[in-house]
C-alpha cells in the first residue's frame, strides 16, 4: 500500500474543502492530514452487522465528530440513504467505509461530492481502486473489519492510543464474523444482542468496549427471551430441501440464529428475505459448513454484484429470478 504521507501530497485531487456556515470556503488541506486529524468530521458508512457496528465504535472513538451510517445490500433503503448522505457534502469532511468496499455507484457519488475517502475492509470480493487519487485502501483478509480498524488506527499508522478497552470487543466480533468459534458462546451471544438492540442502541451500549468479566444483566435477560422467539419464528417459515443436501428457508429476521442451527445440518443453506429491500427484490444469504467450496467466489463469478466469504456470502436478486439463480449457484458449487 502506498505510504499515506507520500500519497496525500498530490494536489489538487487530495484537497478537502472546509466550508464556513454561510457556505463560503474557509480553506483546504490534504488528504493525509485529515486521516491524521482526529477532529475531522467523518461520514462513516459501515456494514450493518455486528462487525460493521464494532468497526463504527472504533471509528467513533478515533474521530469523535464522526457520524456512523449503517449500509447493507444495494437496492435497499439504507443504500439509498448512504448515497444521500454522501451528496450532503457540507455536513462532513471525508468518508470512511468500514467492513465493506464501495461499488461503482457509490464511488461516483463520492467523486461528485469531491471528497477523499478511506476503505477498511477484509472481504475476499473487495474491489480495490488503488489508483483512485481520492482514496486510500486498507484491505486485508484474515481479520474482520472491526479488528482491522482497531489495528489500523492504533498500530498501522499509530494515530491513537488508549483504546485497549475496545480490543476485546473487536476480538469477539472477529471470532463471530470469521466463524472461528473459539470464543463461544460469547461471540454468538454478542451477535444476538446486536440484532436485539439494533445498530444505534448497540453502538451506544458498547461504545466503551466489552468487559472481560462478561455481559451485563440486561444483555443476559435479552438472551433468555430470545431463544423462545426464535423457535416460534422458525416453525412458521416457508422451507424446502434443495439438491446437493441443501436447504432453503424464507426469513426476514433471526438469520444468525437460523444459520447457527441449520448450517451444521446441510452442505449449503439459503436464507431468502424481502424486508429492507426494494419491492420485487429478494436478499439471498448463502452459507456452507464445507471448506472445499467457495460461495463468495462463486457469486462473484456470476458477475451480479454479490459476494462475501468462502463460507458465507450474499446476493440481491429479482424475486422472479430467485429459484433459477439458486439452482445455478448450487450447480456451480457442487458440479465442478
Residue ranges and their predicted role:
Residues 185-229, 243, 247, 251:
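An accessory alpha-helical subdomain
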